[in-house]
């Protein structure tokens, strides 16, 4: 078992990574939001079971959560425990941050992607109609309990897709960790628990370091967490890939962009593509001409766009990055680099 703490405006968050974690040591007066189909993590605690996926992040479901908290007598001494994937954790963060102006929150992520990404950062949101994350808060959990036991039955494709985020942390923030991931790809795919524990732990340490210095996205430093996501989001929406698969494709596209701009050696692009492939992730995707055009067009609506440019975090070498203003046309070229015509 590994643990660390990170600081923020509300105090300190404890992060624990291991197998068979003793939840009771970290939680007092729990009420639980649990994703449908999961075993009850805290027997006897009042529990509201919800569906997983993006649909849970609605005002209708949020109202249901508020009603549940009121019915069970939740107050500011209560701990809201969120058990599930990233979407449910987002909803729970919003609910905890707004119910009675804030109650204690503990995250128990049950997918690898949620462990290395959504569980840490303090972002909570619900969607408004077709607009994702339109209404949101920053609200840090008191604890994040990454129990690797949940991953034993995670479907293989879903499991593998999360490694795109792990590779991202190494590429952008820690060259030594990137080398470690490259050398331990087989162990990670085999679900070697020692390797997996370190991968989750180090990924969260790196993300926490960013959150500590730019908790509210005011300094531009947190932009580094978007490496691979500018192109990745467009590819995800058009081709229906899993989030991690789309990020993997986006990483290759944005590394190629960095190389063409003279920041990154071409050999690093090829190496990263090889690492992602070794983890079972795509590095390019077949697309129709229409899909290619749609993905390129979506880049124009990226939230980081300012006029005819998009601010993109570019890796300049493993472990180092810069925030660069890139012409939209250049980003569209990057999309076309990883989407090749296949229908």
UniProtKB/Swiss-Prot annotation:
One of its GO terms (molecular function) is metal ion binding. This is 3-dehydroquinate synthase. Signal peptide: none annotated. Its EC number is 4.2.3.4. It catalyses: 7-phospho-2-dehydro-3-deoxy-D-arabino-heptonate = 3-dehydroquinate + phosphate. NAD(+) binds at residues 86-90, 110-111, 123, 132. Zn(2+) binds at residues 165, 229, 243. It holds the Pfam family DHQS_C. Its cofactor is Co(2+); Zn(2+); NAD(+). Binds 1 divalent metal cation per subunit. Can use either Co(2+) or Zn(2+). It comes from Pyrobaculum islandicum (strain DSM 4184 / JCM 9189 / GEO3). It is found in: Cytoplasm. It is an enzyme of class 4 (lyase). Belongs to the sugar phosphate cyclases superfamily. Dehydroquinate synthase family. The lineage of its organism: Archaea, Thermoproteota, Thermoprotei, Thermoproteales, Thermoproteaceae.
